[in-house]
Amino acid sequence: MKKQNLIHAEGLVTESLPNGMFRVLTDNGCQILTHISGRIRRNSVRILPGDRVKVELSAYDLTKGRIIYRLSNKSSND
């Protein structure tokens, strides 16, 4: 069942908070308080400050969201 009224955005993790919470600065300049989705938590994906993430926001409260995907870093020196 797909959820309605969701807004997707990309941003940069600026701060790691207790209990799996993070502050994310989106590409349009908004600061959002986010938590990790269950799928990321279950697969033990590590999210650190400086990572690019994809965030899902509710249309009713644009200050809180859920991290649904960690984007790969293009600036690796491999």
Curated annotation (Swiss-Prot):
The keyword Protein biosynthesis applies. SUPFAM superfamilies: Nucleic acid-binding proteins (SSF50249). Residues 1-72 form the S1-like domain. The keyword Chloroplast applies. Keywords: Chloroplast, Initiation factor, Plastid, Protein biosynthesis, RNA-binding, rRNA-binding. It is found in: Plastid, Chloroplast. One of its GO terms (molecular function) is translation initiation factor activity. InterPro entries: NA-bd_OB-fold (IPR012340), RNA-binding_domain_S1_IF1 (IPR006196), TIF_IF1 (IPR004368). Its main location: plastid. Pfam families: eIF-1a. Component of the 30S ribosomal translation pre-initiation complex which assembles on the 30S ribosome in the order IF-2 and IF-3, IF-1 and N-formylmethionyl-tRNA(fMet); mRNA recruitment can occur at any time during PIC assembly. Belongs to the IF-1 family. One of the essential components for the initiation of protein synthesis. Stabilizes the binding of IF-2 and IF-3 on the 30S subunit to which N-formylmethionyl-tRNA(fMet) subsequently binds. Helps modulate mRNA selection, yielding the 30S pre-initiation complex (PIC). Upon addition of the 50S ribosomal subunit IF-1, IF-2 and IF-3 are released leaving the mature 70S translation initiation complex. PANTHER family: TRANSLATION INITIATION FACTOR IF-1, CHLOROPLASTIC. NCBIfam families: infA (TIGR00008). This is Translation initiation factor IF-1, chloroplastic. The gene is infA.
